[in-house]
Each structure stands twice: as structure tokens, then as C-alpha cells.
């Protein structure tokens, strides 16, 4: 697990470097895979490893992959809320559908697992988890304002630091679905 943690933090930092300094269109893949692996290495030491049960990991990955397809159909194709201006079909499929959505959800899941270890009261979770979801979404979206792997079309409610406010609320919905999945797949102990 130590190697996974080192590799994870290196990939995470590479993702940040690619976004902030190179303005690379593939920064997000490194960022989310690295963030997931790094937090997985921390959480596994605390007795909560998603990797420990391969069937659970693959089920979560597939569920997040399907969720990403549904989000893309509704938000991108039907509502035209965002697009990926520099991606052809192959890169879109690889970096958005296969890597992006599953790993950002796994990264978010690891983040929420880590937080629940510090806040033992389930009452505190009702305050901490929504705030954490918005902060997690903000970090993902703000970093993208330097690289623009995806771009938003004008949306209602305005923007905050280049991020549509409605998108921050959608992150809240996306990441708060994860605790339900955590109960279903037995990640809470």
C-alpha cells in the first residue's frame, strides 16, 4: 500500500502541475486517479480499503461509470451545459467516461471515508459531508479553470471564481449519493 500511496500523491501532484502550469487537457485523469490512490492508501491503514474487496471495487467502478454516462447524456447532450472542446471521441471516452467519472467518484468516496473517521457522530456528518462535497467539487472545478478540459456554457445563478454556482450544487448531489452507496456496499464500519 505504501507504493500505491507514493504513486498516488505523485500522480495527484502531476495532475495539479499539468493544470496550473501546462494547461494540459488531460490533467484531470492524473488528478483523480492519483487522489484516489493516495487516499486509498491512507484509508486502508485505518481498516477501510476499497481495494480489499475486488468485487466491491469493480461494482463501484461500474456503477460510477454508468452514472457518468447518465450525467453526460443529461447534462452534456440534452441540456448542453458543458462540452469538451479539445477532445475527439477516443479521448472523450478514455478521459471522461472510463477514467474521469469513475475515479472522481472513487476519489470523493475515499475523501468522505477519511472524513467519517475524524467525525464519529452521524449528526456531525449531516453538516460535514455536504460542506465537504461542495469543497471537493470546488477544488475539482477551480483547478479546471486553468486547463479547461471541459467548458461550461452560460448557466443560471451566475458564477463564483469562474465556476457556475449550479455546478457546485450538482457536486453536492453527486457526492451525497455516495454515502448511500457506502451503506449499501458496507464501507461504514
Label for each model-derived stretch:
Residues 1-189:
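Aromatic-rich, lipid-facing transmembrane alpha helices and their immediate juxtamembrane interface loops
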Amino acid at each position: 500500500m505504501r507504493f500505491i500511496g507514493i504513486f498516488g500523491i505523485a500522480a495527484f501532484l502531476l495532475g495539479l502541475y499539468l493544470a496550473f502550469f501546462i494547461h494540459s487537457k488531460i490533467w484531470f485523469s492524473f488528478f483523480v486517479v492519483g487522489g484516489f490512490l493516495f487516499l486509498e492508501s491512507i484509508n486502508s491503514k485505518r481498516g477501510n480499503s476499497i481495494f480489499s474487496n475486488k468485487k466491491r471495487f469493480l461494482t463501484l467502478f461500474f456503477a460510477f461509470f454508468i452514472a457518468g454516462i447518465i450525467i453526460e447524456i443529461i447534462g452534456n447532450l440534452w441540456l448542453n451545459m458543458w462540452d469538451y472542446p479539445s477532445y475527439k471521441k477516443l479521448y472523450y471516452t478514455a478521459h471522461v467516461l472510463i477514467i474521469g467519472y469513475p475515479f472522481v467518484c472513487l476519489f470523493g468516496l475515499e475523501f468522505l471515508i477519511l472524513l467519517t473517521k475524524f467525525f464519529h457522530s452521524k449528526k456531525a456528518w449531516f453538516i460535514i459531508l455536504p460542506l465537504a462535497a461542495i469543497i471537493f467539487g470546488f477544488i475539482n472545478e477551480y483547478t479546471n479553470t486553468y486547463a479547461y478540459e471541459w467548458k461550461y456554457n452560460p448557466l443560471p445563478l451566475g458564477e463564483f471564481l469562474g465556476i457556475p454556482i449550479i455546478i457546485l450544487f450538482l457536486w453536492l448531489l453527486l457526492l451525497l449519493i455516495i454515502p448511500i452507496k457506502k451503506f449499501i456496499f458496507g464501507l461504514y464500519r
